[in-house]
Amino acid sequence: MAKQEYKQLPKRAEVHSATEQFKDTVKTSLGLDLFKGLGLTIKEFFSPSVTIHYPMEQLPLSPRYRAVHNLQRLLDSGSERCIGCGLCEKICTSNCIRIITHKGEDNRKKIDSYTINLGRCIYCGLCAEVCPELAIVMGNRFENASTQRSQYGSKSEFLTSEQDAKNCSHAEFLGFGAVSPNYNERMQATPLDYVQEPSKEESQEETPTNPESNKGDENV
């Protein structure tokens, strides 16, 4: 293997006198490097802003965004959708959901307590996927900072108010396959976008013909 040769740059001459130092300072300050930096700064100053004034302004979130959970109600009656089956508690990988139920007079499950430990939750969304009644869904409330754990995690914080359910002021859960807002603008080109569809002549040439089927048609 040949030895690689490195090119050594000449060292910069040392400046000793005050006149030379002044000339070097003026050359460095008023040189092309300074104007290049200023030109880039001025260009970005007049370009459209890519940031927003948070928290006064917020970007729209995707329906598939996974934040703090919501416990839904029925839109017509305002009753709770949760039937106390416990599937969300069983499938939870972080073991953060706790449900306490009892049988009522009509032999149906009644929910005594429903808690979610947000300190352990990893927001995977498995509880929302397995729920047969769409009772628990992933919401878009991501501003949940608190100084005490006792301030969040109870059922009353996740449950949709009965008034909002009857007034239909809360949107129905669109599901994990819902389309995000402005998806056309945010969609990036994939390799399949560059594949051209074959023309009609090429497709006809590529379709094979079965001679046995043709013979059968002639005999008929």
From Swiss-Prot:
Annotated cofactor note: Binds 2 [4Fe-4S] clusters per subunit.
Chain positions covered by the region annotation Disordered: 187-220
Keyword NAD set for record: yes
Listed Gene3D superfamilies: 3.30.70.3270
Gene Ontology biological-process entries: aerobic respiration
Cofactor section: [4Fe-4S] cluster
Keyword entries, A-Z: 4Fe-4S, Cell inner membrane, Cell membrane, Iron, Iron-sulfur, Membrane, Metal-binding, NAD, Quinone, Repeat, Translocase, Ubiquinone
Residues holding [4Fe-4S] cluster 2: C92, C121, C124, C127
Membrane topology (UniProt): Peripheral membrane protein
Reaction equations catalysed: a quinone + NADH + 5 H(+)(in) = a quinol + NAD(+) + 4 H(+)(out)
UniProt subcellular location: Cell inner membrane
Residue ranges constituting the 4Fe-4S ferredoxin-type domain according to the UniProt record: 71-102, 112-141
Pfam assignment, any one: Fer4_7
Subunit record text: NDH-1 is composed of 14 different subunits. Subunits NuoA, H, J, K, L, M, N constitute the membrane sector of the complex.
Function of the molecule: NDH-1 shuttles electrons from NADH, via FMN and iron-sulfur (Fe-S) centers, to quinones in the respiratory chain. The immediate electron acceptor for the enzyme in this species is believed to be ubiquinone. Couples the redox reaction to proton translocation (for every two electrons transferred, four hydrogen ions are translocated across the cytoplasmic membrane), and thus conserves the redox energy in a proton gradient.
HAMAP family with a match to the protein in the record: NDH1_NuoI
Similarity comment: Belongs to the complex I 23 kDa subunit family.
Protein name stated in the entry: NADH-quinone oxidoreductase subunit I
Gene designation: nuoI
